[in-house]
Curated annotation (Swiss-Prot):
InterPro entries: DUF3654, UPF0329. Residues 304-424 are annotated as: Disordered. This is UPF0329 protein ECU05_1680/ECU11_0050. The lineage of its organism: Eukaryota, Fungi, Fungi incertae sedis, Microsporidia, Unikaryonidae. It comes from the Eukaryota.
Length: 612
């Protein structure tokens, strides 16, 4: 360990991560009276997140599970210790011996206990980190915890060093020696004070809880956006070798004024604290968080809550209106049904009455006929009687059986400009045509792919609607510039946006990648790479890194008349998509040409998190 005079050493080292309490590298900080290192409940390996605040042991798989279990069992307590307390380096090993005697076994025991509880599967990682802090810095009511005792031993050693200054040095050197170690003793008194240790535990608990709530409340793609934007994993990485840290598990931190953070939590509540922690995760430095900034965040949160309340009231009002309309429709439907029923009943009654009338008429007709018959019979009888007197009398004609005559009637009844490379625009064509062109092309990556593979890849590459967002003035609100690099003799730029692709009943979170180079003649950026890459939270670090872009990019770009102006791009007939721009998202929706209400695919690009 190197010699440090100006500050207490706060360390997260490669040695700690590699299952050893021995420190090989150190990061030093000068802390103010109220400043404190806060450990975030996220565990990293290289660029990637291995453990989230909400991760339980059962969520971990394979090698990640073994490595995390080993880290917890052997190193978690030592890592927390060197973040929060650190150590004093001197020319001999007296400090190391005291630490080994009093703290090493104590910390190992806490790590083993925390690991056992975490493996039980009930606790989240954030809760385990809280427990480790509580156990290490535990102070009883009398303020006589293990760390306090260790601190007293350190102070006694420092007092002894001050009293027994080295011999053989001048009076001036002796005064300087005692002055320096007196300052160190004063600092040690602060570091190991009961008040500070209790505050350490309280603040860490608040931060861990805030991180947990952030992860629980955000959608996967929103959390991906937060982590992609954040710089919390960069502070430690800047002080430790890239290759070394790429193979180690490590925690990250920030230095913040704990008194201000506690005051903010007590005055403004959990919502403001959560937003402050979120801003830290987005890269806000602790020394930038003062009372003025806290008030600014509180106002932002208050305004957001007001808008949310208005939105809820509006939605509630709409819901009530919708409910009233629905009830009105039901009443009208019921009324129409009853009216229809009544009308049907009325018609039935009318029909019944008509039948009665018809029967009456029939009876009247029958009676008339009967009377006619009677008259005829009377007349006929008279004629017969007259015929008896005269045989030459004529016989009258009669209707046989009383039949009626038939009537003969039947019953009645300003923007940014981009050029598009052919390797991007060809994805708008049919799979057969795409395959034909790739097979004739020079890129080994695509030559010889099956038609099925081309069809699958078309879903991820045929996203030309992204260009509408890219050339708009709001592009920077959605896309993160991951930096420039050179490959195959050309300078290239890569931009990434977090998004969700819905296709074939699947919902896939990932990133929209845009690769560009500058046209040498016009200086206009040319889009030569455009795709949606499926990735989860655990792979975000790699996907966002410049190394990933360079490794996965094509070796050489054919620049010989291979691109056209973006405005000339046209989709073939029958293809339909529309773009929908909202405050926090940009959507591209592909509909069925024969039935526009049916959505075939939807790509939603998330807005970057708001930095206050």
């Amino acid at each position: 360990m190197r010699r440090i005079y100006a500050a207490w050493t706060l360390v997260a080292a490669a040695g700690v991560m590699d299952c050893s309490p021995r420190l090989e590298k150190a990061a030093a900080f000068t802390l103010g009276p109220d400043s404190q290192v806060i450990v975030f409940p996220f565990m990293f390996q290289g660029y990637n997140i291995v453990v989230l605040p909400t991760t339980k042991y059962g969520d971990l798989k394979g090698n990640a599970r073994r490595r995390v279990a080993s880290f917890l069992e052997h190193n978690i307590s030592h890592a927390v210790w060197y973040f929060v307390v650190g150590g004093i380096a001197y020319k001999d090993d007296r400090s190391e011996r005291l630490f080994s005697e009093m703290m090493d076994g104590y910390l190992k025991k806490i790590s083993a206990g925390a690991s056992k509880v975490y493996k039980g599967g009930r606790k989240m990682f954030s809760e385990s980190l809280e427990t480790v802090h509580e156990m290490i810095f535990e102070c009883n009511k009398a303020g006589d915890g293990h760390v306090v005792k260790y601190g007293k031993s350190i102070i006694n050693r420092l007092s002894d060093m001050i009293e027994n200054a080295p011999t053989g040095i001048s009076a001036e050197e002796k005064r300087e020696y005692r002055r320096f170690w007196s300052r160190v003793k004063e600092r040690a008194g602060f570091l190991y004070s009961t008040e500070r240790l209790r505050r350490v535990v309280e603040v860490e608990k608040i931060v861990c809880n805030a991180c947990k709530e952030i992860c629980l409340k955000l959608k996967e793609e929103e959390l991906m956006g937060l982590l992609a934007e954040g710089k919390m994993k960069k502070d430690l990485k800047a002080t430790v070798d890239e290759d070394e840290i790429g193979h180690c598990l490590y925690l990250e931190y920030t230095v913040v004024n704990t008194s201000l953070l506690l005051d903010a939590h007590r005055e403004h509540g959990g919502d403001v604290t959560r937003e402050l922690v979120k801003q830290m995760l987005l890269g806000k430095k602790g020394d930038e968080i003062d009372r003025r900034y806290i008030n600014k965040v509180a106002n932002v949160v208050k305004e957001r809550q007001r808008r949310e309340m208005e939105k809820k009231e509006e939605e509630k009002k709409k819901e009530e209106e919708k409910k009233k309309e629905e009830e009105k429709r039901k009443e009208e439907k019921k009324k129409k049904k009853e009216e229809k029923k009544e009308e049907k009943k009325k018609k039935k009654e009318e029909k019944k009455e008509e039948k009665k009338e018809e029967k009456k008429e029939e009876k009247k007709e029958e009676k008339k006929e009967e009377k006619k018959e009677e008259k005829k019979e009377e007349k006929s009888g008279k004629s017969l009687r007259e015929g008896e007197a005269s045989e030459e009398a004529e016989m009258p004609s009669v209707e046989v059986g009383g039949a009626r005559r038939k009537t003969g009637k039947k019953s009645e009844g300003g923007r940014k400009r981009y050029k598009i490379h052919r390797r991007v625009s060809r994805w708008r064509k049919s799979p057969e045509k795409i395959k034909e062109e790739w097979d004739k092309g020079s890129e080994e990556k695509w030559r010889g792919r099956s038609l099925e593979e081309i069809k699958e890849q078309k879903v991820f590459h045929d996203i030309m609607g992204v260009l509408e967002l890219l050339r708009s003035e709001d592009a920077d609100k959605f896309f993160i510039d991951t930096g420039d690099y050179t490959k195959g003799g050309s300078e290239r730029q890569r931009m990434v946006a977090i998004g969700v692709l819905e296709s074939g009943g699947k919902r896939m979170a990932g990133v929209v990648e845009v690769g560009t180079f500058k046209d040498s003649s016009s200086g206009c950026p040319v889009v030569y790479h455009l795709m949606f890459r499926v990735t989860g939270i655990e792979g975000m670090g790699d996907v966002m890194s410049p190394e990933f872009a360079e490794a996965n990019d094509i070796e050489k770009i054919d620049k010989n008349r291979e691109y056209q102006d973006e405005g000339m791009f046209v989709y073939p007939r029958g293809v339909r998509f529309e773009t929908v721009k909202e405050t926090d998202a940009f959507q591209i929706v592909w509909g069925n040409p024969s039935n526009t209400s049916k959505v075939l695919r939807r790509l939603t690009i998330q807005r970057r998190p708001y930095v206050i």
